[in-house]
Amino acid sequence: MVAQIKGNGRLRITNVGGMNANNAEAENVRVITKFSGAIDGTVQLCDASVHVNGNYSTTPRTFDTVEVVRSAEDVRKLGIDVGDFVCFDPRSRITESGYIKSRFLDDKLSVGILQAFAQYLKDENLTPKRRVYVHVTVYEEVGHG
């Protein structure tokens, strides 16, 4: 999530959920704004030049040392604001055999299976012998297991 718009126009982000900053560097992201849609960007180390930054390899990757890069004059014009969500590219692929590989599938896949099952019951006009409840929580995304 966007935690701060820095004076240079770059975004400081904060973690919501299980993404680790070690896995965020150089990843493509979309900033989902309140009114302006989605804005594409890239997460970079704050001092990302390996040729100039002598501590590049040893700099800890935390959400205080990586940022989403945008030019200063464009950030506000784009409608980006504190609290907007930053979504990492899941790099989803379906192989020729039908195998689905992607990041962040754990909860989404489970919800998709439950939705498909409910749709199947409806389409086939089937009624289970017992009452079935579909319950989805968001506790993992706010720090609960």
Say what each PLM segment does.
Residues 1-145:
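N-terminal hydrophobic/helix-forming segments and targeting peptides
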